[in-house]
Amino acid sequence: STPIKSSAASDVYKRQISVIENLLNKADKVMICGAMAYTFFKAQGLEVGKSKCELDFVEYAQGLLEKANGKIILPVDVVSVKVSDEDVAADFFGAIAKADTKVVDVRNIDKDSQGLDCGPKTIELFKKELVGAKTVVWNGPAGVFEVEKFAKGTKAICEALANLDGATTIIGGGDSAAAAISMGYENKFTHISTGGGASLEYLEGKALPGVTCLSDVK
């Protein structure tokens, strides 16, 4: 069978968790970064500090890690910052843009910090995992790419996918599509879907009404 690898990263936890579970039955590897990764770090018993983490799904993530049999690839380092809750509440993007960044191993995330992008070692790990892939689905950015200093992971993944030789590369989701377009890579992908919700439903294995109707046409 041809290698199928997938990168999932998003704040839409419920749907993304379902996507990951569905992809584990089809993909050779599922690479998880962005906000979703911290729920899986927590599931491994790691400190995540103030990083976005959906506690209601930690136990579910533990189950996915157990059934994945090594298919799930998680970041090994992250770009973190320390910002006060008050500054974040007042102006999140402004606060993190001014904050000093620190690259830390995922096992050493400080309780007062939050991860906002994957680190350089993770970028190299993901690029290595993508080598030889024949089909790749990318959904969601690797970090807070709206702020330049936290866009390196997203840019690196986008560039790596755009330059994969002989691979079918599909972007599902508005943020990923926006990142690819902003980097001028929109013509380097096999297909870009800007319908984030519909893309996620399809990746969950659900039937899309429009597609179903088209399939029924004789």
For the regions a protein language model found, what residue spans apply to each?
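Charged helix-capping and loop-helix junction motifs
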Residues: 150-159
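Single conserved hydrophobic/aromatic residue that forms the stacking wall/gate
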Residues: 1-9, 13
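Active-site rim loops that border cofactor/substrate pockets in soluble metabolic enzymes
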Residues: 70-135, 141-148
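A short, aliphatic-rich alpha-helical micro-motif
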Residues: 6, 24, 130-131
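Short, conserved loop/helix-junction motifs that constitute active-site signature segments
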Residues: 23-26, 159-167, 185-187
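Acidic, glycine-rich loop-and-beta core segments that form the ion-binding/anion-interacting portion
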Residues: 16-75, 81-82
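C-terminal functional extensions of proteins
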Residues: 49, 54-63, 68, 79, ...
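Glycine-rich beta-strand-to-loop/alpha-helix junction loops that act as flexible
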Residues: 10-11, 32-35, 139-142, 170-175, ...
